[in-house]
Amino acid sequence: MLQLQNLRVTIDDQEIINIAQLDIRPGTRLGLVGESGSGKTMTAKAIAGLLPDETKVSGSVMFAGQNLLDLSDRELAKLRGRRIGFVFQDPARSLNPMMRIGKQVSEAIRLHTDLKGKAVTDKVIELLHQVQLPEPETLLRRYPHQLSGGQQQRVMIAAAIAADPDLLIADEPTTALDVTVQEEILRLLISLSEQRNMSLLFVSHDLGVVQFVCNQVAVIYGGNIVEAGDIDSIINRPQHRYTAALLAANPGMPKDDNFSAFIGRRLQTITGSVPAVGKFPSGCRFRNRCQHASDKCQSIPPVSTASPDHRYLCWHPAQGFS
């Protein structure tokens, strides 16, 4: 479906992203997870060709047998709407406040399908129904400000899946929503992926959310994929010290609604912060924050495997998590 090979993104000769390999198989849901500044959104936008003009992208982004980096802007725009859908973080900033909802969704349909006339309106209603919006016939005549944040995000998802894409990229789609609405949107994305056999690249800073949504995960730090593979294997047996630290800093969920077990509990924290662009240390980019770092970590670790579907880059693997 999608294969990244030696993907490198730079701005003013400063390296931001350097991903040796990342694969998304057909029908899978892969979570791209890391702290703010780790390169998650930049990677997602590099795949979709949405980076600003001043960035330079090299390597390969293979999708359906073609390298997206070789396409013209026009070719990429056509493929992006028809084969790849993109859902942004903040729907209020992505929707046109001066345009009715039906018009905005219908634009995606007209651009990327052969439907015309009443068939377009029927498709808009069908899509709004699929994303579980009530009274779609009435809602399509409303403006974005008349909708809640959760409803706005459902509209964005409807527009993104209008042409029945093979891959949907969701960039922290629940960031601006309250917890209850977040869960509804997450369940919707899972349902749409399963119903349409649509691959999902789900960008998040929260491993717990990724575990809920995805069956594959890639952990990114400093623009590098440091661990990737089956979600259960990585959650239960993290190897890279950064992955283990993320899990230790995640409160998780109480068992049997026993919230009293969480009272007074101290969460572990990760010392320091993600280095600024151009300030990455040599070798393992996490080594300046890692309690287990040694001189060996000044050189780039080789790719190691914990299982056939679990790869990592770490000189001192965690060998499990408890």
Give residue spans per PLM region.
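ABC ATPase NBD coupling module
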Residues: L68-G85, L111, S233-P238, P275-P281
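P-loop NTP-binding/switch modules centered on Walker-like glycine-rich loops
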Residues: P173, L177, V181-F259
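Conserved ABC transporter NBD signature motif
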Residues: K56-N67
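A short, proline-enriched helix->beta-strand linker immediately N-terminal to the Walker B motif
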Residues: A162-D166
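Conserved ABC ATPase signature
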Residues: R142-L147, Q151
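Conserved ABC ATPase "signature" region
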Residues: N67, A119-T138, L247-A248
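Charged, flexible cofactor/metal-binding loops and thiol motifs
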Residues: D230-S322
